[in-house]
């Protein structure tokens, strides 16, 4: 097989994987490894679903500073922060707009590991991330108005209590009063958000409810040297999962589905996401835009059928705010598991994570699950590795003869190439025979890299001794040092490149990679260390026991 054919095989294989993956995602195929989510029944109460998508534009949604009211000469009331606590959340609701202004996720430790916390929603001088709602279509209550807590009582989920409800009432504006109720359920990262619209005026009203996520472009908990997606995302049955880059919003060039009666909108970051999930069947417009030099929003606008005087309408929605755990996400809403983004290797990464999860269920430790999965993958690919290492061993055996031929014919490149080709033919050696078996394995190992990088299950997960968190770098750099040593050993087992420059590069590569791996999450470095050690063992066994060839004089 010559180099052209090898390159063609590589291009064909990678293209096939990418095309099939895109086809899978564009058609919203359910996971082969997890249960499919069930659709939520369409809205039926109070005409909340509306009759058609509103024609208003995203610019009509109030865009005053996130969570802050525009200046007025005589503010009607002073906003307050209402603190609450559940088994999975600590948070604050700002009475200005009844906005979910702070939300800290809690992960209980097991006694050996401490509790883990991450603040998802926040509104400080250095970071803004909010979930808010309001009404459009008139001078109706929105996120700039100060609400009043209704029936103020306990704000903590205690004892045998299964749910915590917090309600907030708006001032009357345009003949409309809004009562917003948050329902927090024990053990759940899904928050029920009910918007009750009362027409207390003398004329019918046709408001539109907006639900949006607002945040800046500040990345949090992103590993050094590793890029993960940060920004809005939209899911609809028509276009399926669409990521929106902040840079596209900067240029007003974002391309996404603008109207639907299904799906959700989200803000995605490393390990965690939030998503507004309106009722299925309720028509809505979808918008995403930049509203400040470093502030963005994504949301939906859901029209409400006409409400007669003295009548009311309920608009129910769900707000997910939590970790990107695949099994949980699959059960919440169709396509929500896609916020855990594996990129173009999704088709391979999802089964790998499924297998990793099964192994973890057996051994009870994510570190050992990584080790065992790596061993299993190496065992599956052993025949391909054997073919590659045999070819490399043969090349190593004839390297002295190749160098002698290059020295003999260095002044005549044509004769040198002819002599080398004759040597390959005589010894039945393909100089590129070790490439294709390795290339075929590359997508699998890249996929496993993304599985370990994207899986929130690694966060706070210990392995042994000094490794207390597989999502953080090795505190004593022991694994990166082992990684560097294994790379040096592996390099020494390979044939020495005839080109002195290439030879120096091969010696320098372990150093360069080791510098990066010093800052990689420990789980990723563990995978590479185990993979390298197994590769060294395989290569040693094959070259010494199976691929031995007697040296022949030049």
Curated annotation (Swiss-Prot):
InterPro entries per record: Membr_insert_YidC, Membr_insert_YidC_N, YidC/ALB3/OXA1/COX18, YidC/Oxa/ALB_C, YidC_ALB_C, YidC_periplasmic_sf
Keyword set includes Cell membrane: yes
Record localization: Cell inner membrane
CDD domains in the record: 5TM_YidC_Alb3 (cd20070), EcYidC-like_peri (cd19961)
Residues of the signal peptide: none
Keyword Transport: yes
Pfam families on file: 60KD_IMP (PF02096), YidC_periplas (PF14849)
Membrane disposition: Multi-pass membrane protein
Keywords, sorted A to Z: Cell inner membrane, Cell membrane, Chaperone, Membrane, Protein transport, Transmembrane, Transmembrane helix, Transport
Gene Ontology MF terms in the entry: membrane insertase activity
CC per GO annotation: plasma membrane
GO biological process, one term: protein transport
Segments crossing the lipid bilayer: 7-24, 362-382, 436-456, 475-495, 510-530
Function noted in UniProt: Required for the insertion and/or proper folding and/or complex formation of integral membrane proteins into the membrane. Involved in integration of membrane proteins that insert both dependently and independently of the Sec translocase complex, as well as at least some lipoproteins. Aids folding of multispanning membrane proteins.
Family (UniProt): Belongs to the OXA1/ALB3/YidC family. Type 1 subfamily.
Subunit (UniProt): Interacts with the Sec translocase complex via SecD. Specifically interacts with transmembrane segments of nascent integral membrane proteins during membrane integration.
Family matches, as PANTHER family: CYTOCHROME C OXIDASE ASSEMBLY PROTEIN COX18, MITOCHONDRIAL (PTHR12428:SF65), OXA1 (PTHR12428)
Designated name of the protein: Membrane protein insertase YidC
Record organism: Burkholderia ambifaria (strain ATCC BAA-244 / DSM 16087 / CCUG 44356 / LMG 19182 / AMMD)
The organism's taxonomic lineage, starting at the top: Bacteria, Pseudomonadati, Pseudomonadota, Betaproteobacteria, Burkholderiales
